[in-house]
């Protein structure tokens, strides 16, 4: 699968580690090494990171003091903080990285320009897409799906703490059943929390497969993309 183009979505919470907040540099280093293994296999990589380890727009707006729009913009800025951290970690690992933001902040990153992003990918650079879609009321899952479609990614990978999609939370229910493969319709209609409905609908409309996999299993991303080993993931298509 040489020259495959993928977009990997990491949750912000994943960066927090055991502390549950902030950024754990050991996890950053682990992720950057996983990304490096993809680049060395001639896989073009785009990245979107959430901001939940710093702030969530919905949570910030819960008591009505902060408006939802402002809360969401705060969340977008949190993804930029995570993006800078990821850029540093990937560069420390020896990768060439560019970050593009949906909200202009030229002192920190390039503005999101689709053609430029694609050119970076073609040159073997990792591209981090930050600040969500630039609009409130849209999740970073939706931003990841949107960017994946825009850059022509063959697949979007949602890197999580579990090895796929289950019919219920495997951390709470010992009898949870793993769903190896499911349709977009199942993901939408059965209320299975793969991504939010907007993300899944966008993926469905553009025939973009969604892979859900365990980000903490070393070598898992490369094994899935290069060897087609689907044992440690689920696919929505």
From Swiss-Prot:
Highest taxon of the source?
Bacteria
Activity regulation behaviour: Allosterically activated by GTP. Inhibited by UTP.
One example of a Gene Ontology biological process annotation: UDP biosynthetic process
Q: Which reaction does it catalyse?
A: UMP + ATP = UDP + ADP
Residues reported to bind UMP: 51, 72, 133-140
For whether the record's keyword set contains Transmembrane, the answer is: no
Q: Does the keyword Nucleotide-binding apply?
A: yes
Annotated region (Involved in allosteric activation by GTP), positions in chain: 17-22
Coiled-coil stretches are none
EC assignment: the record states 2.7.4.22
- EC main class here is transferase
The alphabetical list of record keywords is: Allosteric enzyme, ATP-binding, Cytoplasm, Kinase, Nucleotide-binding, Pyrimidine biosynthesis, Transferase
Amino-acid positions noted as binding ATP in the UniProt annotation, renumbered to this chain: 9-12, 52, 56, 160, 166, 169
GO CC terms: cytosol
Q: Where in the cell is it found?
A: Cytoplasm
Q: Which InterPro entries match?
A: AceGlu_kinase-like_sf (IPR036393), Asp/Glu/Uridylate_kinase (IPR001048), Uridylate_kinase (IPR011817), Uridylate_kinase_bac (IPR015963)
Function, as annotated, reads: Catalyzes the reversible phosphorylation of UMP to UDP.
Protein family (similarity comment): Belongs to the UMP kinase family.
Task: Write down the NCBIfam families for this protein, in alphabetical order.
Answer: pyrH_bact
Q: Name it.
A: Uridylate kinase
- What is the native source organism of this protein? Sulfurimonas denitrificans (strain ATCC 33889 / DSM 1251)
**Source taxonomy lineage?**
Bacteria, Pseudomonadati, Campylobacterota, Epsilonproteobacteria, Campylobacterales
């Amino acid at each position: 699968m040489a020259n495959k183009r993928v977009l990997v979505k990491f949750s912000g919470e994943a960066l927090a580690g055991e502390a549950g907040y902030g950024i754990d540099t050991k996890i950053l280093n682990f992720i950057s090494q996983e990304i490096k293994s993809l680049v060395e296999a001639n896989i073009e990589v785009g990245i979107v990171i959430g901001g939940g380890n710093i702030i969530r727009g919905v949570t910030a707006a819960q008591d009505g003091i902060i408006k939802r729009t402002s809360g969401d913009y705060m969340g977008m800025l949190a993804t930029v903080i995570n993006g800078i951290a990821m850029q540093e970690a990937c560069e420390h690992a020896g990768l060439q990285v560019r970050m593009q933001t949906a909200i202009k902040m030229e002192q920190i990153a390039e503005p999101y320009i689709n053609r430029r992003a694609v050119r970076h990918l073609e040159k073997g650079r990792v591209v981090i897409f930050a600040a969500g879609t630039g609009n409130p009321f849209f999740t970073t899952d939706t931003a990841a799906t949107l960017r994946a479609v825009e850059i022509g990614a063959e697949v979007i990978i949602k890197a999580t703490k579990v090895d796929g999609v289950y019919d219920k939370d495997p951390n709470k229910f010992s009898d949870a059943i793993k769903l190896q493969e499911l349709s977009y319709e199942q993901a939408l209609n059965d209320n299975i929390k793969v991504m939010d409905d907007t993300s899944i609908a966008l993926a469905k409309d553009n025939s973009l497969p969604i892979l859900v996999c365990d980000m903490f299993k070393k070598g898992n991303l490369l094994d899935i993309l290069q060897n087609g080993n689907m044992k440690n993931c689920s696919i929505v298509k």
